[in-house]
Amino acid sequence: RGSVDYKDDDDKTISCTNPKQCYPHCKKETGYPNAKCMNRKCKCFGR
């Protein structure tokens, strides 16, 4: 399907203003290497 596997469990997501804040968090909490800052919350994804 090629859809991106987003992970944003509300208990694990953190607020952000910049995706750079999300990368270490995502790697630690989810193991996912990529991140975006959407609606001031980190979204973690695998590809």
UniProtKB/Swiss-Prot annotation:
<dbReference type="InterPro" id="IPR036574">
    <property type="entry name" value="Scorpion_toxin-like_sf"/>
</dbReference>
<feature type="signal peptide">
    <location>
        <begin position="1"/>
        <end position="12"/>
    </location>
</feature>
<keyword id="KW-0800">Toxin</keyword>
<dbReference type="GO" id="GO:0005576">
    <property type="term" value="C:extracellular region"/>
</dbReference>
<feature type="site" description="Basic residue of the functional dyad">
    <location>
        <position position="36"/>
    </location>
</feature>
<protein>
    <recommendedName>
        <fullName>Potassium channel toxin alpha-KTx 7.1</fullName>
    </recommendedName>
</protein>
<keyword id="KW-1015">Disulfide bond</keyword>
<keyword id="KW-1220">Voltage-gated potassium channel impairing toxin</keyword>
<feature type="disulfide bond">
    <location>
        <begin position="26"/>
        <end position="44"/>
    </location>
</feature>
<dbReference type="InterPro" id="IPR001947">
    <property type="entry name" value="Scorpion_toxinS_K_inh"/>
</dbReference>
<comment type="function">
    <text>Potent inhibitor of the A-type voltage-gated potassium channels. Most potent inhibitor of Kv1.2/KCNA2 channels. Reversibly block the Shaker B potassium-channels (Kv1.1 sub-family).</text>
</comment>
<feature type="site" description="Aromatic residue of the functional dyad">
    <location>
        <position position="45"/>
    </location>
</feature>
<dbReference type="GO" id="GO:0015459">
    <property type="term" value="F:potassium channel regulator activity"/>
</dbReference>
<feature type="disulfide bond">
    <location>
        <begin position="22"/>
        <end position="42"/>
    </location>
</feature>
<keyword id="KW-0732">Signal</keyword>
<keyword id="KW-0872">Ion channel impairing toxin</keyword>
<keyword id="KW-0964">Secreted</keyword>
<dbReference type="GO" id="GO:0090729">
    <property type="term" value="F:toxin activity"/>
</dbReference>
<dbReference type="GO" id="GO:0008200">
    <property type="term" value="F:ion channel inhibitor activity"/>
</dbReference>
<feature type="disulfide bond">
    <location>
        <begin position="16"/>
        <end position="37"/>
    </location>
</feature>
<dbReference type="Pfam" id="PF00451">
    <property type="entry name" value="Toxin_2"/>
</dbReference>
<comment type="similarity">
    <text>Belongs to the short scorpion toxin superfamily. Potassium channel inhibitor family. Alpha-KTx 07 subfamily.</text>
</comment>
<keyword id="KW-0528">Neurotoxin</keyword>
<keyword id="KW-0632">Potassium channel impairing toxin</keyword>
